[in-house]
Amino acid sequence: MIQQESFLTVADNSGAKRIQCIRVLGSNRRYAHVGDIIVAAVKDAMPNMSVKKSEVVKAVVVRTKATLRRETGNSIRFDDNAAVLINEDKNPRGTRVFGPVARELRERNFTKIVSLAPEVI
């Protein structure tokens, strides 16, 4: 579960390395799960890239350490909390996605992120 002040690694090549959650988008929501959109501040970025440090961005959560329970009864858990930066059209800002992503992103209409990911779990 991601909440305000949570740090996430960035799973794309947009230039940001770490982001900190500022707000979970939605009506009075406290926690974000896989597939939810958050507003975040870039805390660590690579030089000479499109995303700069202290920039406020939107991101979609693709992996969480918290256990994700599926309708089939399966549960899945990742090793880190990770997100992919998106633009206003909900398309990824980077051209590559690193690491596995959850299948729930396809149900939330983030098909571009799913197609860029090397593995969908």
UniProtKB/Swiss-Prot annotation:
Cystine bridges: none
Which SUPFAM superfamilies does its entry note? Ribosomal protein L14 (SSF50193)
Tell me one GO molecular function of this protein.
large ribosomal subunit rRNA binding
Q: Which GO terms describe its cellular component?
A: cytosolic large ribosomal subunit
Q: Which InterPro entries match?
A: Ribosomal_uL14, Ribosomal_uL14_bac-type, Ribosomal_uL14_sf
Q: Does the keyword Magnesium apply?
A: no
> Does the UniProt entry include the keyword Cytoplasm?
no
The protein's UniProt keywords, in alphabetical order, are: Ribonucleoprotein, Ribosomal protein, RNA-binding, rRNA-binding
Q: Which Pfam families match?
A: Ribosomal_L14
* BP GO annotations: translation
Functional note: Binds to 23S rRNA. Forms part of two intersubunit bridges in the 70S ribosome.
The family classification in the record reads:
Belongs to the universal ribosomal protein uL14 family.
Oligomer and partners: Part of the 50S ribosomal subunit. Forms a cluster with proteins L3 and L19. In the 70S ribosome, L14 and L19 interact and together make contacts with the 16S rRNA in bridges B5 and B8.
Task: Tell me what this protein is called.
Answer: Large ribosomal subunit protein uL14
